[in-house]
Amino acid sequence: MSKEGLIAAKELKRLQTQSVRLDRFIGSHVSRLLKSDLVSVLAEFQRQNQVFLCMKLYEVVRREIWYRPDMFFYRDMLMMLARNKKVDETKKVWEDLKKEEVLFDQHTFGDLVRGFLDNELPLEAMRLYGEMRESPDRPLSLPFRVILKGLVPYPELREKVKDDFLELFPGMIVYDPPEDICEDSDEEARTDSDLE
């Protein structure tokens, strides 16, 4: 990131609570940044989980003349929103992605579904899973296995995905963890705390 990018990032963080000044700064300074700086500032804010600023820069990037719809751009936004449990923003980004006809590959779908599951957003994860099933891409077993592992805390949802997996890949085996796996870890935690 260049000096201009660093200055812009610092100023954006400083102005984020002052909407009028923030919008003015975005219009006068941020929109003049080089593509690499603008994308770097957005990536840094994603890393820092600065949801509000990420959404602002997301809109700026999409208005740029050089912008082309990109699977990785959307994947990074959705993963950051999942980490921060931002369902409304996720729906907005997903609508934009659909309008721009961006297609995810099966591995990216698997990573996204798992990201939402790991952040305790099973409804959003299953909505993405539905999109994955409707995708024109040929189904692959690895993304299903990634999703099945993330669904261990949600047995009903796991059974549905497991049935789909066995229908698509009839010769494959699905590992089912012991039913008391969650109970065992809770008991171990209690036992450890009792010893202290």
Curated annotation (Swiss-Prot):
InterPro entries the UniProt entry points to:
Pentatricopeptide_rpt (IPR002885), THA8L-like (IPR044795), TPR-like_helical_dom_sf (IPR011990)
**PPR repeat coordinates:** 70-104, 105-139
Upper classification of the source organism reads: Eukaryota, Viridiplantae, Streptophyta, Embryophyta, Tracheophyta
Name of this protein: Pentatricopeptide repeat-containing protein At1g62350
Q: Known PROSITE patterns for this protein?
A: PPR
- Ion transport keyword on record: no
Q: Does the keyword Repeat apply?
A: yes
Which UniProt keywords are listed? Repeat
Q: Which domain of life is it from?
A: Eukaryota
Q: Which Gene3D superfamilies does the entry mention? A: Tetratricopeptide repeat domain
The entry's family comment says: Belongs to the PPR family. P subfamily.
